[in-house]
C-alpha cells in the first residue's frame, strides 16, 4: 500500500525527545522524555532496568523537591514524632540510601560494559526486537508446565484525562439529574414526560415547560428548527430533536458534537417506533394531544431504554459513532461454507414461498454479525440492526436454546409504518459460556412462524453436523498481539465498502474483569478517546472534512505533580513504610497520542501507548495495522453474505 507521508506534520522538536540509535528496532526510535528517567515505552523493567535515584532526606525531615517521593509536609509531621520514631526513621533512610547507591553502581557497571549484556531480562537485541514487535505483550513459559501463555509484561491501562469519566461512574440510573454530566429526556409536544435517564418526574417537569417554550419560539420566529444550545463557560450542550408529537433532548458536558447527540436521540426515537410504529403513534396523538404515552408502553420498554442509554453513555459502543456494524472475525473458508449451508437449506424448502423469508441473520455473542441471508439488491439499515441486536442482548438473553420467540418489530429505517415478524432462537452452546449466539429469521407474514421454525430446526442440525456451530461459539476474534504493530494500545478499523468495523479484544489487566467497575471505567475512557479522535475528522453535521486526511491528537498533562496523601489519615509507622516502600512512587504522567486516518476505502482510529509521542513511529505502526486488516479482509468482514 503506497502511502503519502506528506500527511505527517513536522517532527517534534529534538529538545523534547531523546532518540535511540537509528539502526535499532527496524528504524523505530525508542522515545524518552528528558524530564523522566524511564523510557516512555513503559516496559516496566522488561527491556531496561530503571535505577532509582538515592535522595537523602534533609535534617529537618522535609523531602527534597527533586526526589520522586510524594511531596509531603513532613516538617509538620516531624514536630509530632517522638525522638525514638525520628531515630528509627533516620536509620531506615540510611539503609535506603545505601541500597539505592548500590543499585546505581550495578546499573552503571552493566551499561558501561563493552559486551551487549541485557541482564537477566533479555539475552540479545533479537529478544528486544521480537518482544517490541509484540507491542506490550510477550510469550512466557508457564511455571507449571511448558505451555506458553500470553500475559502483559506491563500495565496496559491508559491514563484518565477526562474529568467527567470518574464523576459519571458514580451516577446511576434514575438518580438526580443534577449530579450527572449526561442525560436524555423524552416528552410529548404537550409537555407530558415520557422518559428520563436520570431523575424523576417531579425533577424534570420544570424542564419540559421551558424546553417546549424555547422550541415553540424558534418554530414560530426562527428560520429553521432549533437543534443545539451551548454554554461557553460550563461546556454544557443541549441538543433537541423534534419528532412531533415526540420531542427529545440530550444534555451533555462531554464535548460531544451536535451530530453525535442527534444520532443518539434518533436512536432512542427509533426504539420507540420499533415498539409502536409511526402510524400507531400518530393515531394515538391525533385523538388527544395531551395523551400520556407512558400508559401505552410496557415496563420492558422502559427497561430497554435504560439499557440503551447506559450502552450509549457508559460503554464502548462505536456502532453509532461510526454508523456501522461490528463483524465477527471468522475463517474465510468457514464463512463461505456457512453461507452455502444456509442457501442449500433454503433451496430445499419448497414449502417456503418466495418472499416469505426476507432476511436471515446469525448473531454471535457480543452482538457481532456472523452471517447474513438477504435478497439480492436489498440490505437492512444499520440502525435497524442495532435495535434488533439490543433487543436480543438485553431483553431476550435469558432464554435458553429450547425456547423460541415470534416477535413483531418495526424497523423504522426499513418501513416506519408497519411491522416485520422475527423468529428468534438461541443456538446450542457446549462451551459452558453464558454468551449465546442467535439465529434470526425475518418475515413480513405474521403466519409464517411454523414454516420458519421447521427451517430453523433443520438448519441448526446441519450446522452441528458440519461442526460450524462450534466454530461460531468458539471464535473470539483477534488480539492486539496478533498484529505486528508495536506502540499501539487499541484501534478501530472501519471498512467503508462493507459498513463494518473491527477492533481487538479488550485486554485489561488479568485482575480486572470487564464487568467490574474498573472495567467499565476503562471502557468509558477508551470511548472518550475515540470520540475526540473522530471529532477531528468530521464536521458538526457529521460529514467528513475530506475524503483523505490524517490527524494526530495529543493529550498531555503539564501538571505531573507527585501524588498527594492525606497526612491526617496516616500514622507514623505507615509513613515510615510508605517512604521506604515507595521511594520512586510517582503519579503517571499523561502523554498520549491518537491518530485518525481517513481514506476513500477505510477509516482507522488508533491510540498509542502512553508516552509514545513520535508521530512517525505511530504512523508506521498504523500502516502495519492497515496492511494487516486489508490482508485479512475476507476473514474480518462480510462482503456480500448469502444472497438469494
Curated annotation (Swiss-Prot):
A Gene Ontology cellular-component term? fungal-type vacuole membrane
The reported result of mutating residue 406 to A is: Disruption of YPT10 binding resulting in reduced Rab5 homolog-dependent GEF activity toward YPT7 on membranes but not in solution
The principal location of this protein is membrane
Q: Where is the composition biased (Low complexity)?
A: 64-79
Tell where it localizes: Endosome, Multivesicular body membrane; Prevacuolar compartment membrane; Vacuole membrane
Stored InterPro entries: FUZ/MON1/HPS1_longin_1, FUZ/MON1/HPS1_longin_2, FUZ/MON1/HPS1_longin_3, Mon1
**Entry remark concerning the domains of this protein:** The disordered N-terminal is involved in autoinhibition of the MON1-CCZ1 complex guanyl-nucleotide exchange factor activity.
Please name the PANTHER family in this protein's record.
SAND PROTEIN-RELATED, VACUOLAR FUSION PROTEIN MON1 HOMOLOG
The similarity comment for this entry is: Belongs to the MON1/SAND family.
Q: How does it assemble?
A: Component of the MON1-CCZ1 guanyl-nucleotide exchange factor complex made up of MON1 and CCZ1. Interacts with YPT10; this interaction has a strong preference for the GTP-associated form of YPT10.
What the protein does comes down to: In complex with CCZ1, is required for multiple vacuole delivery pathways including the cytoplasm to vacuole transport (Cvt), autophagy, pexophagy and endocytosis. The MON1-CCZ1 complex acts at the fusion of vesicles with the vacuole, through its regulation of the SNARE complex during the coordinated priming and docking stages of fusion, and particularly at the stage of tethering/docking.
Protein name, per record: Vacuolar fusion protein MON1
Taxonomy, top ranks, is: Eukaryota, Fungi, Dikarya, Ascomycota, Saccharomycotina
From the UniProt record, report the name of the gene that encodes this protein.
MON1
Amino acid at each position: 500500500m503506497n502511502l503519502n507521508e506528506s500527511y505527517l506534520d513536522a517532527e517534534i522538536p529534538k529538545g523534547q525527545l531523546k532518540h535511540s540509535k537509528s539502526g535499532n528496532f527496524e528504524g523505530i526510535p525508542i522515545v524518552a522524555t528528558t524530564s523522566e528517567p524511564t523510557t516512555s515505552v513503559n516496559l516496566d523493567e522488561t527491556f531496561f532496568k530503571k535505577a532509582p535515584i538515592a535522595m537523602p532526606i534533609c535534617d529537618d525531615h522535609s523531602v527534597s523537591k527533586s526526589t520522586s517521593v510524594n511531596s509531603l509536609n513532613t516538617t509538620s509531621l516531624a514536630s509530632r514524632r517522638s525522638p525514638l520514631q525520628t531515630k528509627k526513621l533516620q536509620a531506615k533512610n540510611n539503609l535506603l540510601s545505601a541500597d539505592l547507591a548500590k543499585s546505581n553502581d550495578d546499573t552503571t557497571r552493566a551499561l558501561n560494559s563493552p559486551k551487549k549484556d541485557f541482564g537477566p531480562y533479555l539475552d540479545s537485541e533479537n529478544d528486544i526486537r521480537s518482544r517490541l514487535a509484540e507491542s506490550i505483550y510477550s510469550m512466557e513459559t508457564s511455571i507449571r508446565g511448558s505451555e506458553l501463555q500470553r500475559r502483559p509484561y506491563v500495565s496496559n491501562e491508559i491514563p484518565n484525562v477526562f474529568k467527567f469519566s470518574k464523576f459519571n461512574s458514580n451516577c446511576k440510573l434514575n438518580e438526580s439529574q443534577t449530579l450527572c454530566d449526561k442525560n436524555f429526556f423524552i416528552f410529548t409536544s404537550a409537555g407530558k414526560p415520557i422518559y428520563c435517564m436520570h431523575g424523576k418526574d417531579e425533577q424534570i417537569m420544570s424542564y419540559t415547560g421551558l424546553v417546549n417554550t424555547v422550541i415553540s419560539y424558534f418554530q414560530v420566529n426562527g428560520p429553521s428548527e432549533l437543534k443545539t444550545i451551548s454554554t461557553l463557560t460550563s461546556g454544557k450542550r443541549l441538543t433537541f430533536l423534534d419528532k412531533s408529537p415526540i420531542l427529545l433532548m440530550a444534555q451533555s458536558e462531554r464535548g460531544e458534537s451536535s451530530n453525535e447527540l442527534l444520532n443518539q436521540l434518533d436512536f432512542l426515537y427509533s426504539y420507540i417506533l420499533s415498539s409502536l410504529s409511526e402510524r400507531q403513534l400518530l393515531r394515538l396523538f391525533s385523538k388527544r394531544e395531551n395523551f400520556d404515552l407512558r400508559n401505552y408502553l410496557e415496563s420492558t420498554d422502559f427497561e430497554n431504554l435504560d439499557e440503551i442509554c447506559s450502552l450509549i453513555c457508559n460503554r464502548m459502543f462505536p456502532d453509532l459513532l461510526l454508523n456501522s456494524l461490528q463483524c465477527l472475525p471468522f475463517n474465510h473458508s468457514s464463512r463461505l461454507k456457512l453461507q452455502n449451508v444456509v442457501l442449500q437449506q433454503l433451496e430445499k424448502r419448497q414449502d417456503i414461498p418466495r418472499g416469505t423469508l426476507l432476511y436471515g441473520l446469525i448473531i454471535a455473542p457480543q452482538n457481532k454479525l456472523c452471517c447474513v441471508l438477504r435478497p439480492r439488491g436489498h440490505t437492512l439499515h444499520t440502525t435497524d440492526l442495532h435495535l434488533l441486536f439490543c433487543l436480543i442482548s438485553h431483553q431476550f438473553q435469558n432464554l435458553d436454546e429450547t425456547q423460541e420467540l415470534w416477535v413483531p418489530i418495526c424497523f423504522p429505517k426499513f418501513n416506519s409504518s408497519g411491522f416485520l415478524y422475527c423468529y428468534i432462537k438461541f443456538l446450542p452452546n457446549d462451551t459452558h459460556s453464558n454468551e449465546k449466539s442467535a439465529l434470526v429469521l425475518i418475515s413480513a407474514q405474521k403466519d409464517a412462524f411454523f414454516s420458519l421454525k421447521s427451517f430453523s430446526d433443520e438448519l441448526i442440525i446441519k450446522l452441528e453436523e458440519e461442526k460450524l456451530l462450534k466454530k461460531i461459539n468458539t471464535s473470539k476474534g483477534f488480539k492486539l498481539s496478533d498484529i505486528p504493530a508495536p506502540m499501539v494500545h487499541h484501534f478501530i478499523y472501519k471498512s467503508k465498502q462493507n459498513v463494518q468495523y473491527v477492533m481487538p479484544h479488550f485486554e485489561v489487566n488479568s485482575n480486572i474483569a470487564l464487568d467490574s467497575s474498573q472495567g467499565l471505567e476503562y471502557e468509558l475512557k477508551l470511548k472518550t478517546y475515540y470520540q475526540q479522535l473522530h471529532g477531528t475528522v468530521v464536521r458538526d453535521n457529521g460529514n467528513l472534512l475530506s475524503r483523505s486526511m490524517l490527524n494526530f491528537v495529543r493529550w498531555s498533562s503539564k501538571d505531573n505533580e507527585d501524588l498527594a496523601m492525606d497526612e491526617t489519615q496516616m500514622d507514623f509507622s505507615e509513613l515510615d513504610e510508605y517512604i521506604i516502600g515507595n521511594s520512586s512512587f510517582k503519579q503517571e504522567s499523561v502523554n498520549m497520542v491518537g491518530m485518525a486516518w481517513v481514506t476513500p476505502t477505510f477509516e482507522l482510529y488508533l491510540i498509542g501507548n502512553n508516552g509514545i509521542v513520535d508521530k512517525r513511529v505511530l504512523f508506521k505502526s498504523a500502516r502495519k495495522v492497515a496492511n494487516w486488516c486489508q490482508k485479512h479482509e475476507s476473514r474480518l468482514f462480510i462482503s456480500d453474505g448469502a444472497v438469494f
